[in-house]
Amino acid sequence: MTYLELLALLALQSVVTGATFPDETITEWSVNMYNHLRGTGEDENILFSPLSIALAMGMMELGAQGSTRKEIRHSMGYEGLKGGEEFSFLRDFSNMASAEENQYVMKLANSLFVQNGFHVNEEFLQMLKMYFNAEVNHVDFSQNVAVANSINKWVENYTNSLLKDLVSPEDFDGVTNLALINAVYFKGNWKSQFRPENTRTFSFTKDDESEVQIPMMYQQGEFYYGEFSDGSNEAGGIYQVLEIPYEGDEISMMLALSRQEVPLATLEPLLKAQLIEEWANSVKKQKVEVYLPRFTVEQEIDLKDILKALGVTEIFIKDANLTAMSDKKELFLSKAVHKSCIEVNEEGSEAAAASGMIAISRMAVLYPQVIVDHPFLYLIRNRKSGIILFMGRVMNPETMNTSGHDFEEL
């Protein structure tokens, strides 16, 4: 029996491009994945990269045929596209996102690790190179320690050493023949940076009303801001949306948070592709006081259960049709891992994926205050195309690494 190991890796923070592609296709799929993840852990932080997973699934689709390929296209929302159009989009996006003239750094790297002597169709290898610029490496999976070290070194190299130990020797054995690896790295600086000397310790109130102390950044400036109703017509039914651009204005981080007394779980069920588009079209540039936590999130997700819940099942069974990849029978996906990391600090973001109190008046002010001192959801998106590169939520900053600049305790 033959196994295909897919280890979809990501370390990242934001970016996308203006490729012509129905942005709601990827956005809807991103929202579906987010909703599944929040359903598996009510009080847990969430972090994943729709971009990284889309690239990994694109590589799988390239090797699939028949009902297996049809199932992947249906799950990803590609049915309205002509066959193969999605590959051209992913290629064009990758080329634009990683262009040297961009004011951010983004690396997209793909690699196919193949068992020595294992036959992979030449046409598949050519297409893999053309659409994903993928490397092909021949290894001996029976030497699992050496293979794991080789893959982890490759990942570290492409994520600026932010993501380590993606795989372990136990992930491979004598029947493993293929491993597909996808790595995404992003580093961007805020268009308007937070001054480190303004960072102070602040109380963050979790949904269970307990409090933790966190480093809170602060600045006053012009940002895209809007207030929206959750439809409840109650006093706490208004929530805030803030968009903070990175240098170059192509990429931004969008934050959504309810009023402090309203749990994030009240807002999350409203999340849809159309709502995100409404946020983007409705926020207006204005002066805002922003209090934003400095945080780091690293998360590893077993994609197998999530992809199955989203309708992708055939690639995980021995009847999978991956004959575009290899003539070998009983080739299927036995493992799918997604690892991501994001750091948000005073300068901006980097991904490969601090005590005292400050007094803030919540009384009438000259302009809006966005005080991110309770659970919130966030996404990093390309402002032109609307495509989401990174998505997540912060429920409990106590579990996250908040290291960074030293800050003053008040």
Swiss-Prot record:
Gene Ontology MF annotations: serine-type endopeptidase inhibitor activity
Organism encoding this protein: Mus musculus
CC terms in the record's Gene Ontology section: extracellular space; neuronal cell body; perikaryon; secretory granule lumen
Location(s) in or outside the cell: Secreted; Cytoplasmic vesicle, Secretory vesicle lumen; Perikaryon
This protein's record includes keyword Metal-binding: no
GN (gene name): Serpini1
Signal sequence range: 1-16
Name of the protein in question: Neuroserpin
SUPFAM superfamilies: Serpins
Protein family (similarity comment): Belongs to the serpin family.
